[in-house]
Amino acid sequence: MPKIVDVEQRRSELAEAAARVIARAGVDGASMRDIAAEAGWTTGTLAHYFANKRELLDFTLRASIERRSAQRSERSDLSPADALRATLESALPTDDDTRVHWIVTVALAGAAASDTDLAATQRDAYRDYRGYLIGLLSSMPGIHEPATEAERLIGLVDGIALQALFDPEGWPPERQLRALDAGLLAASMVR
């Protein structure tokens, strides 16, 4: 009897392997051979699921973004203020998973400058994230311009995250969280 393969599961495994290789070696250093080896598969298997490296990179970015987005639904039982804090905290590179996500996002942001599909993926992710934050902020008392506040918070988190990526010793998780809380407090968004 032929073996049944879950195509989406296999593609997800390959994308996770690609993310790990990109985190170690960068986009240019992430060869199809290295990604296949990281996943424990052959390049022939990889080619069966992705026509080329660009397709794999786009899928890898989308998968990373979808994992982050899926975490938002886990916060539906929290108050808007608590969900906002949890969402922003979970976006910071305070653990291996979010650090890899940020490395992939930043690495592929450079490629997105000349690749309209990658640019669209990045743009759509930010629009979705902004919309989610606006929804939370709109339901919080005292927030008069939710869209402006959402943009400010995205800038705050992105700034902290980039500093933490480039200077992990200087920006350990504790410092990232203090900076986040200071930014929220400045806007009177924490209790």
Question: What would you call each of these model-derived segments?
Answer:
Residues M1-Q9, R191:
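N-terminal intrinsically disordered/low-complexity leader segments
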Residues E89-D96, I103-S114, G183:
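Helix-loop "lid/cap" segments that line or gate small-molecule binding pockets
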Residues L118-R123, R127, S139-R191:
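Hydrophobic/aromatic-rich alpha-helical bundle segments in the mid-to-C-terminal region
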Residues E13, A17-E55, F59:
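Helix-turn-helix
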Residues G44, L92-D96, M140:
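Short amphipathic alpha-helical boundary/capping segments
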Residues F59-R62, A70-H101, P146-L153:
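Hydrophobic alpha-helical connector segments
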Residues E66, S73-R75, D97-V106, T116-P141, ...:
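Amphipathic alpha-helical packing segments from all-alpha helical-bundle domains
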